[in-house]
């Protein structure tokens, strides 16, 4: 790695250990919890994992900063890593255009169905959302992976959204 270059590291799951060890002058733009072997702090009391479940500690420690998506996200990372380089952007993730789009979709007529994100990613928990709708006798639509605006449009067609994530979504 060029020592005069600054790096922004986002998804480093596939990054080899030797590559992590040579990186200098980098920040981590954290979207979840890659410091845990499970990547899921919800598995632990108060979101605090046992030390043996902490991974990538030195990579986080050596970062110039670790940028988290929300105050809650930062607090969970801080509880587990006890580092002083963790910050929260605590901002709105949506642009004015997306907020306008959401507002327009919210005004559309709604069916008496509920939307469920149809995801193969386990922590999105599609299975329990479907189970819940069946238990409550709710009609539902499974929304398959699709472009973002189409996903929002599909959400806006139904009465509600059923989502039981297994990890804190930021």
Summary of predicted features, one role per range:
Residues 13-15, 34, 72-74:
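Alpha-helix capping/helix-boundary segments
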Residues 156-168:
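Acidic donor-binding loop of glycosyltransferase active sites
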């Amino acid at each position: 790695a060029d020592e005069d270059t600054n790096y922004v590291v986002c998804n480093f799951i596939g990054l080899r250990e030797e590559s992590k060890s040579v990186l200098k002058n980098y920040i981590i733009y954290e979207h979840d919890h890659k410091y845990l072997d499970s990547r899921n702090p919800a598995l632990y009391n108060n979101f605090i994992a046992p030390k043996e479940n902490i991974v990538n500690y030195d990579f986080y420690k050596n970062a110039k900063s670790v940028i988290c998506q929300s105050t809650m996200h930062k607090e969970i990372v801080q509880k587990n890593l006890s580092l002083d380089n963790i910050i929260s952007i605590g901002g709105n993730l949506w642009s004015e255009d997306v907020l306008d789009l959401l507002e327009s979709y919210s005004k559309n007529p709604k069916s008496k169905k509920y939307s469920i994100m149809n995801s193969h990613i386990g922590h999105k928990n599609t299975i329990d959302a479907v189970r819940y709708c069946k238990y409550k006798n709710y009609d539902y639509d499974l929304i398959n992976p699709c472009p973002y605006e189409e996903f929002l449009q599909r959400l806006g067609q139904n009465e509600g959204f059923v989502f039981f994530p297994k990890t804190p979504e930021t």
